[in-house]
Amino acid sequence: MTTQLEQAWELAKQRFAAVGIDVEEALRQLDRLPVSMHCWQGDDVSGFENPEGSLTGGIQATGNYPGKARNASELRADLEQAMRLIPGPKRLNLHAIYLESDTPVSRDQIKPEHFKNWVEWAKANQLGLDFNPSCFSHPLSADGFTLSHPDDSIRQFWIDHCKASRRVSAYFGEQLGTPSVMNIWIPDGMKDITVDRLAPRQRLLAALDEVISEKLNPAHHIDAVESKLFGIGAESYTVGSNEFYMGYATSRQTALCLDAGHFHPTEVISDKISAAMLYVPQLLLHVSRPVRWDSDHVVLLDDETQAIASEIVRHDLFDRVHIGLDFFDASINRIAAWVIGTRNMKKALLRALLEPTAELRKLEAAGDYTARLALLEEQKSLPRQAVWEMYCQRHDTPAGSEWLESVRAYEKAILSQRG
């Protein structure tokens, strides 16, 4: 007997075929686009190095929803619960502070062995891993400078941390058969009027060159650098600005990270993708939702998320753009936050794949902007939800909001016991 979902699917196939879209091919393409989930949503960026310490670096996780992960086992269990509710390929993005060791490890001494459990877990769950050095929440970052620090010994500490992190990243790629994207973000900047804006950038330039001096297999490891407009306590000057890192990534041919919350509120990263791709080999995206500032709210299926996805698909950037998420909301159930944000990113990608882009390009090239706008708007009414629901069914995940029941059950059975 044909189910309601199957009936809707068959009708959707016909509707999309009428405008030249093969929905089966769209689903195949969607499975080529993994989304890298960020581990730090699960514990408010606490990590395991000093979980009771303060979060610094001009970033904030606001809220105090009960049940946050307190150790690696709890965090992995929470991630597994979230991933069961998200269809399609996924990766996990780790920060260096999520190492596991029985004894304290200085950040400039981290080694692959400190992340062995993560690798074994990733193998068991068929995941790729990505990585980040953690240049914040540390005594040697307390004055607001790391890789651009004027003190040679402190700057060298952070250089060594980033070099050690690259080796961890390469280990991930070698073990898992998929390259690890390692993103360098630093909080360096000043609160008030800065007289010498050049010297810190000169130091950062030299430091980064030393960091990436060791040649690593690009099949295992990809370097990325990330700019930011400002942070709390660094409102007036950020060393690693957009211009700095665009120049660095272009001249050194590293990947460039574009974070949706790291620009002026009137700027959008969807418009930056096609420009940056002319100069850099690869892009890393941190899809987020800034509310008035880099607040890292949970990603919505909104215009900008859709525009980001559409840029990737329209320009066939599957092999040059790495999609990551970066938000941390401690005011709601953290597992639900992962599920909502990641599903929304995947929905946006699917919608982009269901767009009649070839026809739209023809209209645009012909100068028929009336028809272009009309078709762009009319295609929004096509039965995309039926295609999404079939995709979820094929990946054995809930199609609609019933996933929330699973989260609530997990919260009652597991999270509520954490205190």
From Swiss-Prot:
Coiled-coil region(s): none
CC annotations in GO: cytoplasm
GO biological process, one term: rhamnose catabolic process
Keywords: Cytoplasm, Isomerase, Manganese, Metal-binding, Rhamnose metabolism
Pathway of action: Carbohydrate degradation; L-rhamnose degradation; glycerone phosphate from L-rhamnose: step 1/3
Cofactor binding, per record: Binds 1 Mn(2+) ion per subunit.
UniProt superkingdom: Bacteria
UniProt GO MF annotations: L-rhamnose isomerase activity; manganese ion binding
Keyword match Transport: no
Subcellular location per the Swiss-Prot or TrEMBL entry: Cytoplasm
Protein residues bound to Mn(2+): 262, 294, 296
EC number of the protein: 5.3.1.14
InterPro entries linked: L-rhamnose_isomerase (IPR050337), Rhamnose_isomerase (IPR009308), Xyl_isomerase-like_sf (IPR036237)
Catalysed transformations (reactions): L-rhamnopyranose = L-rhamnulose
Family that this chain belongs to: Belongs to the rhamnose isomerase family.
Subunit structure: Homotetramer.
Protein name from the UniProt record: L-rhamnose isomerase
Source organism per UniProt: Shigella flexneri serotype 5b (strain 8401)
Gene that specifies this protein: rhaA
